[in-house]
């Protein structure tokens, strides 16, 4: 079996359930648990992109995948709270479960929401991706967690920094205490854009002077195409927001390069599946 473990993540196979865990977050395993699902046979899609319901069997399979992953990290899948993810910069604070005996998925309360924060124990915050960046946040001082989806549109809106700002302004966190872990996503090697998107990035990130920084953005030699490192952009703006360099932990894994184990929209096209990132504060 291919092992995705590296200096920042460990690849676990528990009773046939595969997932990654960040070594940094494992240092706090008495307080939190977390996972990023691995495998393209699992699919955590709970609704169509246009909000249409899934066929019953497909939804049931997603719930089974959630249950198996949650069981592997010893949390109750019925406590899953999932944002609907519409490439916004909106972040919710979850203070309680809404559905009593079912996961909180496809709820109007989390429509047009791409990030979620809580200080409540046992809630299992979930986001999903197939190339987009997912960020897990943890403040060990205030016992605050967050889970944020940042596609290229979310990155343009700086949703990662807005998550930090909400943790600071509304829940009493300090940026220097916050840990941010970046899950597998499409990387610069495969994130190719046309001039219209390139121009949007240049305009939004003038402060980074990205047009002159080939580590962030690089024009292809023979085409009007550009490769952009959205992960690096998030690292830089999070550091500017006050996070310590050593507290920004990157999985270093590209979804396209690892398409045999991680879902990728660019590889799978219309029938693409979704992986999930979970994080939960443990109860007493």
Which residues does each predicted region cover?
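Active-site microenvironment for binding and transforming phosphate-containing groups
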Residues: 1-284
